[in-house]
């Protein structure tokens, strides 16, 4: 491999890692020109930190509070979107601190999740997804709707709605419109949460 090819591969991998919070997969490294032996070499030398099977982090890249979300998104092959209660935590709406990481994956996703992950299967429309630092996350509105669908308690939902409105992330009319798309318990729960949120605004 020429010196130019090595430099190009290093640049491609670095740019990719930067877009993913300093992380990358073995498959991504291979596509950038790093065969398995070279990957082992960089891991042994400490240039790359092995975070999980087939997932590395650049040693010089600082850790952040979102490392686990980047890591588990990569574990899905990059198809997951951080969602539900985990998305609420990312947007800092309510003081909800979920014990598990909630990810939405396409219906055909078959990988078995570890105990720390809760998978939800759905096809998310592009308008319900935002790019964050190294991972994708559902919008505040979609996060609240999804949380209502899995019956997060009304107090947490109310806190989430109130915080989202105060931060200018959405207006209460958006919640009203979302309630109209829901049925049964989820619609009732979100409606009750909106009424409670309005009392504290």
Predicted regions span which residues?
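Short gly/ser-rich loop at a beta-strand->alpha-helix junction or flexible surface loop bordering the NTP-binding
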Residues: 2-201
């Amino acid at each position: 491999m020429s010196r130019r090819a090595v430099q190009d591969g290093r640049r491609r991998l670095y740019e990719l890692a930067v877009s993913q919070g300093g992380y990358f997969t073995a498959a991504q490294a291979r596509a950038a020109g790093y065969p398995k032996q070279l990957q082992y070499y960089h891991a042994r030398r400490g240039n790359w930190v092995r975070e999980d099977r087939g997932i590395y982090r650049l040693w010089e890249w600082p850790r952040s509070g979102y490392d686990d979300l980047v890591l588990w998104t990569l574990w899905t092959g990059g198809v997951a979107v951080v969602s539900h209660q985990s998305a609420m935590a990312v947007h800092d709406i309510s003081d909800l601190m979920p014990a598990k990481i909630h990810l939405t994956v396409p219906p055909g996703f078959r990988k078995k999740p570890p105990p720390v992950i809760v998978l939800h299967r759905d096809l998310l429309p592009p308008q319900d997804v935002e790019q964050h630092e190294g991972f994708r996350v559902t919008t505040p509105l979609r996060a609240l709707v999804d949380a209502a669908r899995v019956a997060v308690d009304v107090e947490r939902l109310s806190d989430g709605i109130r915080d989202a409105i105060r931060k200018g992330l959405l207006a209460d009319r958006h919640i009203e419109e979302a309630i109209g798309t829901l049925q049964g318990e989820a619609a009732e729960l979100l409606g009750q949460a909106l009424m409670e949120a309005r009392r504290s605004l």
